[in-house]
Amino acid sequence: ETSLPPDISEIKHFMAEYGYSVGKEEVTFDRSSQKMYFEAEKFLTNGEMLAITKILIATRTLPQDKMNQLIEKLEEFASTKDKKRLKELVKRELYHYKPVATLCNDLIDNLYALAEAIDDKQEITITYYKMDKSRIDRRIRPLAIVFSEYYFYLIAVHETDGEWKERYYRVDRITDMIKHRTHFEVEYDSRFDEGKLKNEIQYMWPGKEQQIVFEFTGPSVQAILDRIPKSKVIKREKDKVTIQATVVHGTGIKMTLLSQGSWVKVLSPQSFVDEMKEEVEKMMERYR
């Protein structure tokens, strides 16, 4: 006869005493392997674990060693029986994983240090490398962090000529940070809304909010609606749809629409139509 470990009430008492809250628990004993398995509804399920792992790998945002460490830690929350299966399901993706280049020593440490400054409403000075590799040291007020297309971005305001202007900084290009004793206040109605920004901006190129209308003749209308969250179909015809969207005007939305090739034709506003025409003409010149 095989003796079993303490009953579930004792296990639950032990975990509660040490700060665990696991909800509905189930303990099973596998006689073939002589192992006890503990499962709880607040642990990640196998499906949840696989989904999170796949999403993490697709971001390409962390160095290889950091990605491996993070996935190994997450696997500890998966069901014990299927850890091996989960490893098998992602091992080829991890083997071929190609992270994006970063300049900072530790992206995760950077993120948390910035998050603390945001939460404490604390002014900071960052050492930052721009796209052209030039270095700047800038005193800013950090407001939010967002993730977009492989990179984390810090949204902050910077004082220029007595005015606080919004700026975006890639977190992986911040190589040093000094926290100052100066704190700032943000009125409730003036708080930065990163959710709203994410629904309107493309590729984190800044600009003013603008409503645009364009025709789309591509095979998947839903794909373009998903790519531009604040968009809707306002007219359907046999071979095309007309879409209205609220976007951040600038390079980002042009990149998105141009990526659809001849499937897109911008209808309004006229100023944006002219910008798109000019961009297409520049592209044509490169092929002449």
Residue locations for each model-derived region?
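General beta-strand recognition
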Residues: Y37, T125, Y153-I155, T242, ...
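Short, basic/aromatic recognition patches that contact phosphate-bearing ligands
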Residues: E1-I55, K282-R288
